[in-house]
Amino acid sequence: MKEKKTVFKLFFVWDFEKEELWLNEMAQEGWVLDNTGFSFYTFVRCEPGEYIIRLEMNPSSDYRAFVKELGAEYIGGCVNWVYFRRKAELGSFELLSDIDSRLTHLSRIDRMLSLICLANLILGITNSLNQARCGWLNLLCAAMLSYALGRIHGMKAALEKERSLHE
């Protein structure tokens, strides 16, 4: 039986690049991602640097099949995120290889967060007006999601600026 370990580590939605970097650092140390849950990561022992890990938000089943054709293995998902791993010996493994694909990825995150933020804002205001005690919780969630949206918008603006420099 392979040696396993589970690690609890919290990443915010705008930290997906840091999460991916950490997962690849773990693979470099000989621990490859085998399963994931909300902030829980299960790793199995591997050869250091044997795998490259990538994550993507809410890809279609066609996209998942395409990634599989590239030689990657679907590890699993958590909420709207899916995780892939591929043997490093197969060469470079980039899912978001250009500015346009990165902007599209950030736009998907933006749409999801916007809908959840709007729902929490509406529920928070409605519950506050009806003197429900949970209204403040929805408003707090809306505020946190607004912060996340600001971070995502900042990332998109930086990419747009980078694209304009290359044109």
Where are the regions that the model predicts?
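Terminus-proximal functional modules
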Residues: 1-167
